[in-house]
């Protein structure tokens, strides 16, 4: 599997995504950013229940609350637009990681989202190291970037 398989996704803008001005409602960009990295880890091969807690089975003992996020709009995004969503994750330290999402329309970047998550123990809420499978996803996602830098 090539990184492009799990790092470049598609999103079609629907009527319900937009406000009365006919452009996406601002909160949808962060929603799409989060959904994109969720989809990315699933395509990579990490089951979502291994990352996100399911309190009915308590399989995951780790939670990843968002500690910082931002959205930047560079051009209007309208109903019917087909966007490429490029995911760029990176590890900040042992318990923090960031996922940048770049939204591209017709070859031009039209928006970007940034979400920073903190890895916490589900019971104590203490900071803990990122799980191995998440670290592997981040590392694999950055292999092509690291090769270009060499």
Swiss-Prot record:
GO biological process, one term: phylloquinone biosynthetic process
Record bears the keyword Hydrolase: yes
Function: Catalyzes the hydrolysis of 1,4-dihydroxy-2-naphthoyl-CoA (DHNA-CoA) to 1,4-dihydroxy-2-naphthoate (DHNA), a reaction involved in phylloquinone (vitamin K1) biosynthesis.
MF term (GO), any: 1,4-dihydroxy-2-naphthoyl-CoA thioesterase activity
Keywords: Hydrolase
Annotated pathway: Cofactor biosynthesis; phylloquinone biosynthesis; Quinol/quinone metabolism; 1,4-dihydroxy-2-naphthoate biosynthesis; 1,4-dihydroxy-2-naphthoate from chorismate: step 7/7
EC number(s) stated in the UniProt entry for this protein: 3.1.2.28
Top-level enzyme category: hydrolase
Reactions performed catalytically: 1,4-dihydroxy-2-naphthoyl-CoA + H2O = 1,4-dihydroxy-2-naphthoate + CoA + H(+)
Name of the featured protein: 1,4-dihydroxy-2-naphthoyl-CoA hydrolase
Active-site residues per Swiss-Prot or TrEMBL entry: 19
InterPro entries from the UniProt entry: DHNA_CoA_hydrolase, HotDog_dom_sf
Family per similarity comment: Belongs to the 4-hydroxybenzoyl-CoA thioesterase family. DHNA-CoA hydrolase subfamily.
Statement: the UniProt record of this protein carries the keyword Ribosomal protein: no
Gene3D superfamilies in UniProt: Hotdog Thioesterase
């Amino acid at each position: 599997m090539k990184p492009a398989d799990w790092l470049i996704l598609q999103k079609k803008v629907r009527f319900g995504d937009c406000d009365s001005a006919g452009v996406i409602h601002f909160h949808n960009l962060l929603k799409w950013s989060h959904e994109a990295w969720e989809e990315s880890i699933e395509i990579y091969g990490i089951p979502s229940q291994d990352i996100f807690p399911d309190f009915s089975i308590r399989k995951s003992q780790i939670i990843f609350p968002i500690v910082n996020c931002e959205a930047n709009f560079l051009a209007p995004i309208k109903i019917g637009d087909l966007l490429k969503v490029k995911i760029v994750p990176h590890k900040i330290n042992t318990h923090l990681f960031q996922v940048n999402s770049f939204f591209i329309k017709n070859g031009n970047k039209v928006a970007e989202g940034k979400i920073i998550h903190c890895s916490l123990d589900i019971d104590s809420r203490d900071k803990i190291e990122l799980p191995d499978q998440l670290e592997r996803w981040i590392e694999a996602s950055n292999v092509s970037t690291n090769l270009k830098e060499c």
